[in-house]
Amino acid sequence: MLELAHKLADSDAKFFGGWVLAGVEAHIHGEAVKLENNVLLAKERKAMIQVLGTAADGSVAKELRVFLVLPKRTLGTKQADAVAAAGECVARHVFTAQEIADYVAYTGDENIIHKGEHPIVPGLCMAAWLECELQLKELDWKLSFLSPVYAGDELRVYDDGEKLAAYVGAANVFVIK
């Protein structure tokens, strides 16, 4: 996941500064020898970018599709709706500003929302952490990001058998199907 995020950062940082990750499709089924970015959609306030990883035989080994939106309002001004968590808590973590800075340095993600005194945790940083935490070698995920997670927030991930749902307090912040 991290190598896909690193390649994604090759996208035009000036164009995508301030944009937020609304959703991700991630498919990992082996090692990729070549990665390439493809802009599938680029509009005034929404974009879709694909990172495609091919194996030595030319088959698709990894794919990441990100859905980005440019918010009309300032982030953090609307509280996420409170929802009761269902299922078993399978992972929890508090991301620090240093972890975010390390992720940004490694991937090259220069988005302004991941910097400053109270940075937003990059969505792909959370996805990569969860991939490692669950010790996954392969995955097929559709992630929907519902609300930002900030440095210092405790993120808890629950598995209800059909999906993974992440919470900060009582707010559902992302879902993985």
Model-assigned labels for residue ranges:
Residues 133-156:
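A conserved acidic, glycine/proline-rich C-terminal tail/linker
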